[in-house]
């Protein structure tokens, strides 16, 4: 069996989101064109400069706190000047980070309501939307820029924040099926959908009832997905997850010149059990995902997942080779000093992928 080509590149619902995406509206087309034009007008990084966010990421040049406070006045209570005279928030304060997220989602993504329950993972918006932008590039490989298409995506482990479905729908107009094992998390995402008309009819929620399964029980016979995406649990135990959260808080305090102090797991580095850890950690989760992906090879164009630990890539490559995957790609992403990567694989040849994508094109004048 030939080895895959491995490449490295710099209310729970019954709506048919996974069956076929609806055509994008003229408003979503105009929105993407305006967003792409705005990003393209910004200066590009020079050769040799440190890799940062994706060129189309609206957060590439940091946060405009004045504009954010105007858009979301509740943020004002958490903004303060830094020693250098710039405005910022205390990123170790969970309420500050949650309000920053709500402000970013309102200003840049037209989300009027976003909230998460106490103890839920509070995602960094710039890094999460980076993943979405790189998936757009992956889907339209060879094109100079992604086009507005009919795309169905599956978010594995959407959590209580539903962030990938929100960003993918608002930036690119993609349809989403978002799954999770926690019914409380899904109930919160449904609350977000119910309070944002722009998401209604575009995001379907499905509950995973088997803690040992990932795609099984979620992907239905009539489903067809262009992309799957996932931010897997990093840790192998609750203790490991708690230590990781506390370590991040201490490092943040040290970076600000503060004396580290004892603290519980902060919400912005927190998360509920299924969001942060599982038996076997990230390595085992990815192994299960890869094994199950073979069962749905004909229904999904690209399978993808974030990989936080570089040492977990090698066993993934080996498992994918055994399955006879056609193409494997690793996409590196960087935000500040944090480096993570997207592992992507497809059982379809390039010719089949081109034929698949040709069926998505919505003619435009």
Curated annotation (Swiss-Prot):
Region of interest called Disordered, as start-end residue ranges on this chain: 1-50
Coiled-coil blocks: none
Superkingdom: Bacteria
EC id: 2.1.1.181
One annotated GO molecular function: 23S rRNA (adenine(1618)-N(6))-methyltransferase activity
Entry-linked SUPFAM superfamilies: S-adenosyl-L-methionine-dependent methyltransferases
Stretches with biased composition (Low complexity): 1-18, 30-42
Catalysed reaction, written as an equation: adenosine(1618) in 23S rRNA + S-adenosyl-L-methionine = N(6)-methyladenosine(1618) in 23S rRNA + S-adenosyl-L-homocysteine + H(+)
Keywords: Cytoplasm, Methyltransferase, rRNA processing, S-adenosyl-L-methionine, Transferase
Biological process (GO), any one: rRNA base methylation
Pfam family, one: Methyltransf_10
InterPro entries recorded: METTL16/RlmF, rRNA_lsu_MeTfrase_F, SAM-dependent_MTases_sf
Cellular component GO terms, alphabetical: cytoplasm
CDD domains in UniProt: AdoMet_MTases (cd02440)
Protein location: Cytoplasm
Gene3D superfamilies: Vaccinia Virus protein VP39
Biological role: Specifically methylates the adenine in position 1618 of 23S rRNA.
Family: Belongs to the methyltransferase superfamily. METTL16/RlmF family.
Protein name per the record: Ribosomal RNA large subunit methyltransferase F
Organism: Shewanella oneidensis (strain ATCC 700550 / JCM 31522 / CIP 106686 / LMG 19005 / NCIMB 14063 / MR-1)
